[in-house]
Amino acid sequence: MGLIGWAELRSRVRSFFCGSAEDRDLEEELQYHLERETELGLRRGLSADEARRNARLVFGGYDRVVEETREARGFALIENVLRDVRFAARALRREPRFAAVAVLTLAIGVGATTAVFSLADAILLRPVAGVRDPGELVVVQLAGQPGAIAELSHANISDLRAATPALAGLAGYASRSMQTRTATGAVEVEAMIVDGDYFGVLGLVPRLGRWFTAEELSANAGGDVVVISDRFWGAYFDRSPDVLGRTVQLNAERYTVVGVAPPGFHGTLRTGGVDVWLPAAAYGRMWHRPIDIADREASIFTELVGRLAPGRTPELAEQQLRTSFARLVESYPGMFDHVADYRLNVHEGIGLAVSVREQTGRALRLLLGSAALLLLIGCVNFANLLLFRGVTRRGEVGVRAALGASRPRLLQQQLTEGLLLCAFGGLLGVGLALAIGAIFRGQEFPGLPPIDGSVLNGSAVAFALGSALLTGVIFSALPAAVSLRDALGRTMRSIGRSVSDAGSAFRSGLVIFQVAASLTLLIGALMLVQTIRNLDRVDLGFDAEQVFTFGISPEPQGYDAEAARAFRTRILSEVAALPGITAASVSSFAPFGSDRMLFRITLPGSDATPVRAATNEVSSAYFETVGTRILAGRAFSELEQTAALTDGPGIVLSSTVARSLFGTANPVGQLIEVGGFTGTSLQPVIGVAEDTRGSPRSGPQPSVYMPIGTASLPQTYVLVRADLSLEHTKRLVGSVVASIDPDVPFYTAESLTTAIRRAAAEERLLARLVGTFALLAVLLAAAGLYGVISYSVARRRREIGIRMAIGARPTSVVQLVVGRSMKLLSVALVLGIAGGYAFSTLLANRMFGITPLDPLTYVVACLAFSIVALAASAPSAVAAVRVDPVSTLRQE
């Protein structure tokens, strides 16, 4: 059996499970020997007390003999741990207030950190489901001027694929909204157009059926096949096993199902979930118009995904791709004018758009750092609580040590108590993490779907319990060692006397750290609050109040250009006549947002660099509806709004474009060249509109407005200014659309105010959470400050009594107490200001209209903490003034 024989093992197991009976036998045996030894002492002429004392000395300490016997007969470590847990539970039940405060202190920090960790895990860390070897995948992005739609064609991607040996595979993709019909009407679904061996590059295995064949992926294919997601399969086919070969209607066309994606896979990007995948050849069918995918200028794909060849690096792939792209630009000079100054960037990992990953990642790292700082503040407060508890238990520890308890056993018992508190704190922290998750619910990050709040999973729970355990080991050990050293260093005579100065400086240092760290969070929170205020005050160039946007898509349902124009005209006339509607218009883009196509605007015959302006095709009442002022000239007439661009109806320029082209001259009546993907046309300028912004942070967006006319659009926005609620307006407008054609989808209903607020969603979430963390940190710091000051008053009670006995005024006593608080605060403020500046520097790219050295923020934060310090000192000051000098001197 090795070190332990079978007989001894059986004895130890029996002792472990039947320990109570054996303990009674041991007690009886020891008592018998004590009585026999006491009788021998009495026979030698000793008194009864001396005989009993001599008998215990012979045994070398009764408790020690019991412990050594237990260790010899059983599993000592397990028995001791269980005994210590029971002892700690009884001790904590005797002091429920201490236990509740300690558990809540830890739970606050653990809950906050766990909630943010779970959010980061859900958004950034979890791999895309079903993907093989995700570490080998890279995202290739065409990056350049913000606000432009940069796309590559099927032919361009084929050339890049062939010229990049560092990649084992390269595929393009682009997301588009489509509609499918159900029994209740049209429903919007998310479609992804893919090029190349998209599924093969990702290493996916279909749940049912197959992926697209090489023939189906060719530019000349019919494009009439579809792969559906597992979610779509369940929602629309009830998970029927014979789904393969059946058809599904998307927009106005029908597609044959050839495969079902694996469960959990909803596309390369985690942005809400792709429902269906279509080959590139289906692009023309999507919009119900002929599009030759083989045409090199048929740019569709916004991002590419590649798999690195064995032994190749992302840097090498990026170098080869940039060289290949430069050759394409040189070979086809006219085709790449709008992206000639762009470049291909390679980024490791998939799951999020590169810009979203970088921006949201920074925000989540800031949140995680703030939550970790709050956890550290809670841990320090927890350590301080254990130190104060150690002070009150010095007498108990000293007595137990005198009775024979060893130093390791005493330390183990105190550590067990701390770990038990941490375990409860971790469990409560999981509950608080769920509550904090409610703050996330409905919150949106740019490029991500609204958070549903259900981000807490097994990893997050393990993180919570693990952090609580680590906290218990670290922040219970030091207070236990300090209090044990202090208790064992005292004599039995000193037990019960006033406490000494030992550990006082350490406790004060902990409180200084708490206050400084809390001030750091408070300064950062105030910076973010001012940022939100400044963002809300930005003049965007339109009046968003009571303006609602709705989406309709007649063209994908089979409408030609003329039918779509008639449909929009009828929508406008009927919506404008509804009660409560003050203005209505349609446009190709909503007034807020920067994701628009850029056109080249030049003066005829000029060799100057073209002005790139975001386009928007609008109806005549657009400017009235959104509240954008016409600074010169006029808006479109009702007749002009129905004209095709080739008829030269005229355009409206934004103020920035007008100044760039004409300087201070009046541009109204002048001709300009408008160049887009479909060619160049001469247009007269009929008006100049005030500048608008695509977001509160961006500058004025160069824009050109054209009449919507017979433009063929994948989606049209209906803009309504109303004196009604969004839901009421949605019902009215929806009924109009349904009465004209119930098969035309009606979706994306939201207020313009909501869209604007969403643009600063990350800043609002940061401000809300960092502000919450700062408030909790301030409360914890106030509690710590109160504890140190009250402890100081208790320790100096005799001194205060003597001072008052010899004539000290109450004001001087108050000054003594408050002065102690202010000394701690002054040191903490210096450290906190430095920490606040460092934190604000990290927040700099999130701040707007304010700098990390904003003096008002620091003054307000310091004043707030001064008030908190005074409030925390007030109870102790009152207690000090009420000290009775007579009773104090009598006790001495």
Summary of predicted features, one role per range:
Residues G378-C422, A783-L825, L829, S876-A879, ...:
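Interfacial "coupling" helices/loops that link adjacent transmembrane helices in transporter permeases
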Residues A120-E136, A143, G273-P290, S331-P333, ...:
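Short juxtamembrane loops and helix-capping segments at transmembrane helix boundaries
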Residues S118-L119, N345, A383, L419-L488, ...:
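Small-residue-rich transmembrane alpha-helices
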Residues T69-A100, R132, L352-V356, L386-Q412, ...:
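Alpha-helical transmembrane segments of integral membrane proteins
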Residues G5-A7, E190-E215, G223-A363, A438, ...:
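Mid-to-C-terminal secondary-structure elements
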Residues R97-I123, G378-C379, A423-G426, R507-T531, ...:
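Short, strongly hydrophobic transmembrane alpha-helices
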Residues R126-S177, S299-V305, L535, D539-F599:
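Membrane-proximal extracellular/periplasmic loop immediately following the first transmembrane helix
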Residues M1-L104, R307, G334-F336, N345, ...:
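Negatively charged linear elements and acidic catalytic determinants
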